[in-house]
């Protein structure tokens, strides 16, 4: 990537959101603060993401913050992706980009953005939503969108369901220990 392309990519990361593609959500029976803390810990990703077996902390930081990058190694052993958090609004939102992967997605969908938002639901529940944004300017990108859109949505929902189970099970085990 040339310096001009890198600068343009960084500008887009910070100032422009590509077109909306899909959104998945789940209600987790835990307070917003608990869900936020769990989601902020990058090392927890393999405990709830059904396809991630290992996370490498490229920035050396285990907690999310703008500019932190990490590599996710996927089950099957031959694929990985690098994710970078570019925006964090405490207790509300995390925006992540995908600068590198071995599937070739980043070569076709150059502006892929994932936005995770959290909303308090009553006193003890949290709605977490993951929205996907990317442009599909070329025929190849349009075809990839057509083919992969449902798979991305399904795998994202599986990830959210995994997070829900991990957080709720952790809460249940704490309650059991206290009893």
What are these regions (language model features)?
Residues 23, 43-80, 87, 91, ...:
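Short beta-edge strand/loop motif at the mouth of beta-sheet-based domains
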Residues 8-9, 65-68, 95-102:
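Short Pro/Gly-enriched beta-strand edge/turn motifs at strand-loop
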């Amino acid at each position: 990537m040339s310096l001009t392309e890198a600068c343009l990519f960084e500008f887009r990361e910070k100032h422009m959101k590509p077109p909306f593609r899909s959104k998945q959500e789940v209600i987790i029976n835990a307070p917003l603060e608990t869900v936020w803390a769990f989601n902020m810990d990058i090392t927890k990703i393999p405990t709830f993401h059904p396809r991630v077996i290992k996370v490498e902390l490229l920035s050396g930081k285990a907690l999310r913050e703008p500019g932190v990058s990490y590599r996710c190694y996927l089950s099957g052993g031959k694929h990985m992706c690098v994710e970078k958090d570019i925006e964090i609004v405490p207790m509300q939102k995390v925006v992540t980009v995908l600068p590198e992967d071995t599937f070739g997605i980043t070569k076709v969908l150059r502006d892929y953005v994932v936005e995770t938002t959290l909303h308090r639901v009553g006193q003890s529940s949290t709605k977490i939503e993951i929205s996907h944004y990317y442009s599909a300017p070329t025929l190849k990108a349009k075809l990839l969108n057509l083919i992969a859109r449902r798979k991305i949505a399904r795998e994202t929902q599986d990830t959210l369901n995994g997070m829900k189970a991990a957080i709720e099970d952790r809460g249940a085990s704490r309650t059991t220990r206290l009893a």
